């Protein structure tokens, strides 16, 4: 059973159709790494993350951010089964990468900020509420396989 209303789904999919995955993904992950520097420890292979400008200009940050948002696109197609959609990713992040599931919530909140910046007046309080519900659902699904 889905917690998403028809209005939520419309708000999420309508805005998603306008999102540039590469730009928004890179900015979202970059902001996460700048604002919450302890998250950098998961990205040792990305090279220099020594300053905000190094992070925001890092091609590996941009590429992984795009990968994250591409995965989010799958969630948007499967809003009624977020746990099923993210089952394997939850296992990977839990068992192999040992990522604290709280980081998924932080990333979702940063994404909402980036969407607000990129979409201005179109990002109404109602649209924000739908997106907050969605990123909270994704964070919960990604944390679902943790022991």
From Swiss-Prot:
Red blood cells. The modification S-nitrosocysteine is found at residue 94. The modification Phosphothreonine is found at residue 13. The keyword DNA-binding does not apply. Heme b binds at residues 64, 93. GO terms for molecular function: haptoglobin binding; heme binding; hemoglobin alpha binding; metal ion binding; organic acid binding; oxygen binding; oxygen carrier activity; peroxidase activity. One of its GO terms (biological process) is hydrogen peroxide catabolic process. The modification Phosphoserine is found at residues 45, 51, 53, 140. The keyword Acyltransferase does not apply. Gamma chains make up the fetal hemoglobin F, in combination with alpha chains. Heterotetramer of two alpha chains and two gamma chains in fetal hemoglobin (Hb F). This is Hemoglobin subunit gamma-1.
């Amino acid at each position: 059973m889905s917690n998403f209303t028809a209005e939520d789904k419309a708000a999420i999919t309508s805005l998603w159709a306008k999102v540039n995955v590469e730009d928004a993904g890179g900015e979202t992950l970059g902001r996460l790494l700048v604002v919450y520097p302890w998250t950098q420890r998961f990205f040792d292979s990305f090279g220099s993350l020594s300053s905000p400008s190094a992070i925001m200009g890092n091609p590996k940050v941009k590429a992984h951010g795009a990968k994250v948002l591409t995965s989010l696109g799958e969630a948007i197609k499967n809003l009624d089964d977020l746990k099923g959609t993210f089952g394997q990713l939850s296992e990977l992040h839990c068992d192999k990468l040992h990522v604290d599931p709280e980081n998924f919530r932080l990333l979702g909140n940063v994404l909402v900020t980036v969407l607000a910046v990129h979409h201005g007046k179109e990002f109404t309080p109602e649209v924000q509420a739908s997106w907050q519900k969605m990123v909270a659902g994704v964070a919960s699904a990604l944390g679902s396989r943790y022991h």
